[in-house]
């Protein structure tokens, strides 16, 4: 997959010209430019690991369950699946969240074949897909979302998004008036 480093060069958008071919790298570049713009807005409001909903930590002896929810990581609010982890229950243990990325082809997902029945590309392969999922681990490399001490929840890291703080300030000012 080809992608030029447009962000470093301060390129803002791509201009398609009549009579010229679009390159596959240019489709990837368009997506990257848009994702970077969205991420810059998201990063000004949220921190990686901010829980939007759910993602509660439930401890039952040496098993930790993190409920399904939504969490901001790497520029996107992501759906998370319920996850069960085994802990030692001794000392300090961190529950971390990270993104696991895989490339999906039409071999793994037949719905990626062209569905335009009757066309020359009918049931032909098209673009691969990049799949990103949130993976929880004990003492992993990701963002710390909870800290356990001797098997008990010591700190569930839920920092309020900047918009929540702004809303609270506005509510106090409105109430005071």
Regions found by a protein language model. Give the residues of each.
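N-terminal "first-domain core" detector
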Residues: 9, 14-53
């Amino acid at each position: 997959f080809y992608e030029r480093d447009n962000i470093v060069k301060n390129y803002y958008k791509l201009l398609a010209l009549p009579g010229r071919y679009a390159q596959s790298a240019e489709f990837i570049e368009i997506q990257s430019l848009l994702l970077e713009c969205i991420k810059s807005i998201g990063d000004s409001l949220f921190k990686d690991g901010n829980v939007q909903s759910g993602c509660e930590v439930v401890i039952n002896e040496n098993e930790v369950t993190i409920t399904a929810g939504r969490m901001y990581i790497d520029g996107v609010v992501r759906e998370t699946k319920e996850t069960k982890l085994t802990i030692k229950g001794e000392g300090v243990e961190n529950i971390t969240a990270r993104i696991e990325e895989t490339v999906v082809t039409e071999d793994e997902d037949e719905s990626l074949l062209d569905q335009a029945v009757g066309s020359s590309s009918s049931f032909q392969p098209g673009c691969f897909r990049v799949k990103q999922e949130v993976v929880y681990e004990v003492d992993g490399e990701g963002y710390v979302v909870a800290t356990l001490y001797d098997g008990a929840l010591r700190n569930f890291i839920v920092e309020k998004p900047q918009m929540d703080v702004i809303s609270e300030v506005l509510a106090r000012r409105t109430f005071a008036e």
